[in-house]
Amino acid sequence: MMNQDSLALIKQSIKTIPDYPIPGIMFRDVTSLLENAEAYKATIAILVAHYQSKGFTKVVGTEARGFLFGAPLALELGVGFVPVRKPGKLPRKTISQTYDLEYGKDTLEIHVDAINANDKVLVIDDLLATGGTIEATVKLIRELGGEVSHAAFVISLPEIGGEKRLQGMGIEVLSLCEFDGE
């Protein structure tokens, strides 16, 4: 059971910026949570408590804000942290996955030796909207032989459908707070 006071603190710490980056969008700014040490600590503590007994061997965070939650979570769980990045940012041999955006395509990469067939992987990012980034990340992990069945997010925008998309891939989703709209 998650501490409701901590969850309320987390949600209250996330500022909403209207009409950013374009008119009609209500941007959920997770950096305001990071500025609040108590809220940031509560976020990591809730995630650790939820996942500490699940047997994960790696935490994978997506560029860039997934790193801010994934690295401290991995440290607290005592497992390795693996970054998934935009093309050309990782120095060793990589594999890539291209995915669709609303207006175009994007690509993510992971080191080929970062995940192996014995790894049980938790994926984390700051926000779940369409689920495209995490779908691509899951495909990369599975291509390397890793087992991935859980993804965690600080924020979810359930109306956009990302959770259903990930559940369709066999991913159990945890979101610490939900907001309406885009």
UniProtKB/Swiss-Prot annotation:
One MF term in GO for this entry?
adenine phosphoribosyltransferase activity
First-level EC class? transferase
Q: Does the keyword Thylakoid apply?
A: no
Show the CDD domains listed in the entry: PRTases_typeI
Gene Ontology CC: cytoplasm
Listed GO biological process terms:
adenine salvage; AMP salvage; purine ribonucleoside salvage
> Where is the signal peptide, in residue numbers?
none
Q: What is its EC number?
A: 2.4.2.7
Recorded catalytic reaction(s): these are: AMP + diphosphate = 5-phospho-alpha-D-ribose 1-diphosphate + adenine
The task this protein performs is described as: Catalyzes a salvage reaction resulting in the formation of AMP, that is energically less costly than de novo synthesis.
Name of the protein described by the UniProt record: Adenine phosphoribosyltransferase
Q: Which gene encodes it?
A: apt
